[in-house]
């Protein structure tokens, strides 16, 4: 017996349009890590772009470079090592002070998202550091060293929006952005 996966690009197009409508005025960032979850990033990115994607998100720099070759839309990467060369044209998450300082010292002005820890306990700035981090990032942005595009976090139970911990994390995130 052999298994065959059939990827329905029409369904991907439909779902992208549906999500774009539901997003309203917000940007739709399509996450295409792990070869678009094994759907084929080279096939999915153009379909998503044509149907309303505003940006793409990936885990690694290798994935970011692959997606960058497929689109001119923003590409954001959240897992990278501060010792890596920082590529131009890819937006990077800053989950630690080491990451943020590396971005501030880049030879160009990178775009970043500050990652805040809201309860997943994987990565991100702890609430006790938010004031210091936000002040440093604002100062660096005013000096033209970085461009802060937003904040991000990682929900522990995003697949179950009814879980009360999701509300707890959402409230922590609202505190971070206030």
Question: Residue spans of the language-model regions?
Answer:
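Active-site-proximal beta-alpha core segment in soluble small-molecule metabolic enzymes
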Residues: 3-6, 11-14, 24-178
């Amino acid at each position: 017996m052999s298994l065959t996966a059939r990827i329905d690009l029409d369904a991907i197009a439909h779902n992208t349009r549906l999500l774009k409508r539901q997003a309203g005025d917000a940007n739709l960032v399509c996450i295409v890590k792990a070869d678009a979850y094994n759907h084929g990033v080279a096939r999915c990115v153009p379909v998503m772009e044509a149907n309303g994607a505003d940006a793409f998100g990936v885990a690694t720099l290798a994935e970011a470079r692959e997606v960058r070759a497929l689109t001119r839309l923003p590409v954001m990467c959240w897992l990278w090592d501060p010792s890596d060369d920082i590529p131009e044209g890819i937006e990077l998450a800053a989950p630690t002070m080491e990451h943020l300082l590396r971005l501030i010292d880049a030879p160009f002005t990178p775009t970043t998202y500050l990652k805040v820890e809201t309860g997943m306990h994987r990565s991100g700035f702890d609430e006790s550091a938010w004031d210091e981090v936000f002040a440093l990032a604002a100062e660096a942005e005013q000096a033209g060293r970085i461009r802060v595009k937003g904040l991000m976090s990682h929900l522990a139970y995003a697949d179950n929006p009814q879980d009360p911990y999701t509300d707890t994390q959402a409230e922590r995130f609202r505190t971070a952005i206030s």
